[in-house]
């Protein structure tokens, strides 16, 4: 919006810079942090790596930011995609890795975010973990949109965050 305003001549110089700095992050770019804040509601232990690696009973979630999760996945789960992860869970001795996105609209940057999440389920190919795309927002509206048609036809693990607990069980 700020860029468009500048192009129309409504904002200039310092004023435009201040507006751009004060502009909040898009909601979909905050999803990873918001998603991790959702974990305690699942009532699974969120544990550090040294405990996570040795856990073998029940469900646990690895504690850490996306870069730490990515590093763990690279070292332990044959992960080689150049993207951080939003969740690594362990169900008994089986690992689950996931990318979370909240899509607020169709088209543009939202399509790129959608494709980003699907990259994980399409490209990760290791018996060491199950890859999931955790997607919420407009893509679940039954329509002829590319997003809805894609998730309806894909035979991959794509789900809403609201179903994550059920999926892990």
Tell me what each language-model feature is.
Residues 1-58:
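Interdomain/boundary linker segments immediately adjacent to catalytic/signaling cores
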Residues 16-23, 58-76, 100-108:
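Surface-exposed cleft-lining segments at the edges of enzyme active sites
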Residues 29, 77-79:
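Active-site glycine- and acidic-residue-rich loops that bind
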Residues 74-76, 84-86, 121:
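Generic recognition of flexible, low-complexity loop/linker segments
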Residues 80-97:
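Active-site beta-strand-loop-beta-strand hairpin of nuclease catalytic cores
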Residues 102-146:
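Catalytic cores of nucleic-acid endonucleases
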Residues 132-169:
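Domain-level recognition of nuclease-like catalytic cores that cleave nucleotide substrates
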């Amino acid at each position: 919006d700020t860029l468009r305003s500048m192009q129309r001549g409504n904002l200039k110089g310092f004023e435009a810079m201040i507006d751009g700095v004060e502009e909040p992050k898009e909601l979909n770019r905050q999803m990873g942090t918001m998603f991790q804040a959702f974990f305690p509601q699942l009532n699974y232990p969120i544990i550090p790596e040294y405990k996570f690696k040795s856990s073998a009973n029940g469900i646990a979630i690895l504690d850490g930011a996306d870069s730490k999760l990515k590093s763990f996945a690279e070292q332990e789960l044959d992960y080689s995609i150049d993207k951080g992860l939003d969740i690594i869970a362990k169900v008994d001795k089986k690992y689950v890795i996931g990318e979370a996105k909240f899509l607020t609209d169709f088209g543009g940057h939202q399509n790129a975010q959608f494709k980003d999440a699907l990259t994980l389920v399409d490209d990760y190919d290791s018996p060491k973990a199950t890859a999931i795309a955790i997607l919420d927002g407009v893509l679940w509206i039954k329509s002829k949109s590319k997003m809805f048609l894609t998730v309806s036809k894909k035979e991959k693990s794509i789900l809403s965050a609201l179903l994550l607990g059920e999926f892990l069980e």
